[in-house]
From Swiss-Prot:
Official protein name in the record: Ribonuclease HII
Cofactor binding note from Swiss-Prot or TrEMBL: Manganese or magnesium. Binds 1 divalent metal ion per monomer in the absence of substrate. May bind a second metal ion after substrate binding.
Domain of life: Bacteria
The species this protein was found in: Salmonella arizonae (strain ATCC BAA-731 / CDC346-86 / RSK2980)
One GO cellular component term noted in the UniProt record for this chain: cytoplasm
Cofactor dependence: Mn(2+); Mg(2+)
Length: 198
């Protein structure tokens, strides 16, 4: 992996998203400015960490970061805008929610939303940039908790297990029970289920 070279600035925010692929729920983003005086050991892409480790880091990031913020785009916004534009909106909301204005923003992936400060997209940033790794952890823990809460209301869909992604089990239950109000109606499998139900 090519070592990432940071921009020459102090207040760098990292931004990442979770939940572009699922058929249900919001896309959740986070923005994090880390404190160089309070390093956090073991930051890595949230998908590579165990749930226990993620939860421990989640608490540590919230405690030690100079500033952190969550952003989101709800299913109806995803349906209105499309998933890419809704993700960009959620990222803008996360950055706007920081109580300290960053001087530079590093975003996981290959494109940046329009922001009032300079920004750069970093491919595989969640495993190369500590701030993006931290954002990835906050976003994933938050969204996973939302899926667990939704699972209590709709136990038949198995949201706690598949987190809303289009697994064979989820698609089977979608066909069997139809879509909930939390499903993304513009996504093809949900659209099909709605057409079958009508």
């Amino acid at each position: 992996m090519i070592e990432f070279v940071y921009p020459h600035t102090h207040l760098v925010a990292g931004v990442d998203e979770v939940g572009r692929g699922p058929l249900v729920g919001a896309v959740v983003t986070a923005a994090v400015i880390l404190d160089p005086a309070r390093p956090i050991v073991g930051l890595n892409d949230s998908k590579k960490l165990s749930e226990k480790r993620r939860l421990a880091l989640y608490d540590e990031i919230k405690e030690k970061a100079l500033s952190w913020s969550l952003g989101r785009a709800e299913p109806h916004e995803i349906d209105e805008l499309n998933i890419l534009h809704a993700t960009m909106l959620a990222m803008q909301r996360a950055v706007a929610g920081l109580h300290i204005a960053p001087e530079y923003v590093l975003i996981d992936g290959n494109r940046c939303p329009a922001l009032p400060v300079p920004s750069m997209a970093v491919v595989k940033g969640d495993s190369r940039v500590a701030e993006i790794s931290a954002a990835s952890i906050l976003a994933k823990v938050t969204r996973d908790a939302e899926m667990a809460a939704l699972d209590i209301i709709f136990p038949q869909y198995g949201f706690a297990q598949h987190k809303g992604y289009p697994t064979a089990f989820h698609l089977e239950k979608l066909a069997q029970y139809g879509a909930t109000a939390h499903h993304r109606r513009s996504f093809a499998p949900v659209k099909r289920a709605l057409e079958l139900a009508s």
